[in-house]
Curated annotation (Swiss-Prot):
Positions bound to ATP: 10-15, 122, 131-132, 194
GO cellular component, one term: cytoplasm
Protein name, entry field: Adenylate kinase
Chain spans, region LID: 121-158
Gene name as annotated: adk
Species this protein is from: Treponema denticola (strain ATCC 35405 / DSM 14222 / CIP 103919 / JCM 8153 / KCTC 15104)
Record-level Gene Ontology MF annotations: adenylate kinase activity; ATP binding; zinc ion binding
HAMAP family, per database record: Adenylate_kinase_Adk (MF_00235)
UniProt xrefs under Pfam families: ADK, ADK_lid
Family annotation (CDD domains): ADK
Biological processes per GO annotation: AMP salvage
Subcellular location: Cytoplasm
Pathway: Purine metabolism; AMP biosynthesis via salvage pathway; AMP from ADP: step 1/1
Domain notes: Consists of three domains, a large central CORE domain and two small peripheral domains, NMPbind and LID, which undergo movements during catalysis. The LID domain closes over the site of phosphoryl transfer upon ATP binding. Assembling and dissambling the active center during each catalytic cycle provides an effective means to prevent ATP hydrolysis. Some bacteria have evolved a zinc-coordinating structure that stabilizes the LID domain.
Length: 209
């Protein structure tokens, strides 16, 4: 099962991909993870990627395509994979066609208001990286990490202005992919509003294994 998870930031793509990867035994390939690896190496390229992500904009097609192609060439993708966060543009989708055959494109259906509510409430520990949410996963003590007592912070790309910019970018550049893959009869719509357990159950009904 070679599939793409398509949807705005905050739609729950990463959460569902983790569960599907575990259940179906196929790798979850996130461009976010690929970017973070580049940033961690602190190369000139990694620093450029960090600056772009922090601003809420998108990394260039050429860089993203090269990172994804390299990952898809590994042996663990032979039985299938989940692409999360790629492609984001028609140009990337065209490039992907030259690399691998896609079986299904899962479209996460969710409103912008719900995305803003989810993302603006996220908090991350500045020390250990554990994630919380002011509404859904509250820390025991406001502003303090349950695990290490570190200070909780808002990531630059979780600030409302950055979220709105990311959503605008998504609607302008990525949403056209829905039409692109609809014409290829690959789109499968999933309601991304319910809790993650219900979204997973819906996925398993559509893709029994």
């Amino acid at each position: 099962m070679n599939c793409i998870f398509l949807g705005p930031p905050g739609a729950g793509k990463g959460t569902l991909a983790f569960e599907v990867s575990k259940s179906y035994k196929i790798p979850h390939i996130s461009t976010g993870d690929l970017f973070r690896a580049a940033i961690k190496e602190q190369t000139d390229l990694g620093k450029k990627v960090k600056a772009v992500i922090d601003s809420g904009a998108l990394v260039s097609d050429d860089l993203t395509i090269a990172l994804v192609k390299e990952r898809l060439e590994r042996d663990d993708t032979k039985k299938g994979f989940i692409l999360d966060g790629f492609p984001r543009t028609i140009a990337q989708a065209d490039a992907l066609e030259d690399i691998v055959k896609i079986d299904s494109v899962i479209n996460f259906d969710i409103s912008d208001d719900e995305v803003i509510k989810r993302l603006s409430g996220r908090r991350v520990c500045s020390s250990c990286g554990q994630s919380f949410h002011i509404e859904f996963v509250k820390p025991k003590k406001e502003g303090i990490c349950d695990s290490c007592s570190g200070d909780l912070m808002i990531r630059p790309d979780d600030k409302i202005e950055a979220i709105q910019k990311r959503l605008e970018t998504y609607r302008n550049q990525t949403a056209p992919l829905i039409d692109y893959y609809t014409k290829k009869d690959l789109i499968v719509n999933i309601d991304a509003r319910p809790a993650s357990e219900k979204v997973l159950a819906s996925f398993k009904v559509k893709f029994p294994h």
